[in-house]
Amino acid sequence: MWLVRQLKHVRRLVYRLRRVYDRRYGAQKFRRRLAAAPIKRIVVGSASKHDLAWIPTDRDYLDLCRPEHWAQMLAPGSLDALLAEHVWEHLTPEEALAAAKICYTYLKPGGYLRVAVPDGLHPSPEYIDWVKPGGAGPGQLTNGHQVLYTYRTLGHLFESAGFRVRLYEYYDEMGKFHFSDWDPADGTIRRSRRFDRRNQGGKLAFTSVVLDAVKPGATETSRS
């Protein structure tokens, strides 16, 4: 028990130190990495988990709800791709649409935003209790979720912002799971059919609505 408490204490300390570092140096580091990247792909909402080809960000300097952050850090139409895993459900409906429009502005024509959110049509009552607004998963007091999306409502949100939507994973109203193959090199979604470790023995314990929101353009961004 003592060891467990000490490990928790160390994790909290590391988290606090990382937050201090990000507040002081994160924006400078982000600018340097972005300037050096031949393909400009960034992750929003997760500074700790990202693939090597992607540049992480932090809301201290690139908050989806603060357009001035984006204007200070980026030029419109300059990004090849964005990735947001389990971010949009933390935004109010008004914030969600405004954030989608921000992403549309800063993507190149043909660029894309890969999004994953909890699936409001997942057939497991336990899953829904975890992910619904005000719900609480294991070890959580509350999940901080504002909206529980389905494939229809999430797709409509991004279409309303001007995107063309490609759905990859979702449950439908009849409880059937739909899957279209997607390349993790184009943005790994960890809470998905293939990559979530809770999905064992053919049982889909935790999945997401996964889609690409593509900004229309003459040439779609290369995905490699």
Residue ranges and their predicted role:
Residues 30-33, 45, 69-72, 199-201:
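Short, flexible, glycine/charge-rich loop motifs used to bind or transfer phosphoryl groups or to couple energy/partner
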Residues 1-38:
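Membrane-proximal basic amphipathic "stem/tether" segments
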Residues 222-224:
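Serine residues within intrinsically disordered or low-complexity segments
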Residues 39-125, 211-215:
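Conserved SAM-binding loop
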Residues 35-36, 48, 203-204:
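Short, flexible hinge/linker loops that cap or flank conserved catalytic cores
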Residues 20-31, 89, 148-158:
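Short N-terminal helix-initiation segments at or just after the protein's N-terminus
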Residues 95-104, 108, 112-220:
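S-adenosyl-L-methionine-dependent methyltransferase catalytic module, highlighting the catalytic core
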